[in-house]
Amino acid sequence: MGDKIFHNLSGKTLVATPHVITKGIYHKSLIYMLSHTEEGAIGLIFNRLVNHIDLKSFFKIKNDEITTPVMVPIYLGGPVEHEKGFFLHSSDYNKNLLLDFHNDLAVSSNLEISEDIAFGKGPKNSLFIVGYTAWKPGQLEEELETNLWLVMDCNKEFIFADNPESKWHNALKHLGIDEIHFSSQIGNA
């Protein structure tokens, strides 16, 4: 048996396979892959809307110029470190980036972006996501081999679509998959 070839999925989207992941946080999830190396992987679920927050009060923005609440949706990025918040956003905003993917997406995690969004000076598109998803070395590869995930190229339209409930179905449609006809008896040839 030879060594397995590593395929870096950073900047790709994972689509939960229909009928395989049937409950919990990963059921019908879409995950944008922030980092994928032989040491493990990190991603953000971007279709789990949990609430709306006022940026001004959430980030304790002390500015009298903002007199009304600035409500933004808040998404659950995964089961790890819910106290950490990230903005997955379009690359038109490039101040103090945490990650820049060179595919029209970036990630920020600082107070400055929240203030800029509150003042209307932030990125054209953004999602505020708390928590993240992480895999140990080899864990994601094992999940891919057992067909828990489909992989698709990054698609900003899916990430920033207005209706989070339809994102997963639209991703399947983009991949040419009809959920009704997708077999739960899948495997590798």
Curated annotation (Swiss-Prot):
GO cellular component terms given for this protein: cytosol
Top-level taxon of the source organism: Bacteria
Gene3D superfamilies: VC0467-like (3.40.1740.10)
Family to which this protein belongs: Belongs to the UPF0301 (AlgH) family.
HAMAP family reported for this sequence: UPF0301
Protein name per its UniProtKB record: UPF0301 protein RC0043
Organism of this sequence: Rickettsia conorii (strain ATCC VR-613 / Malish 7)
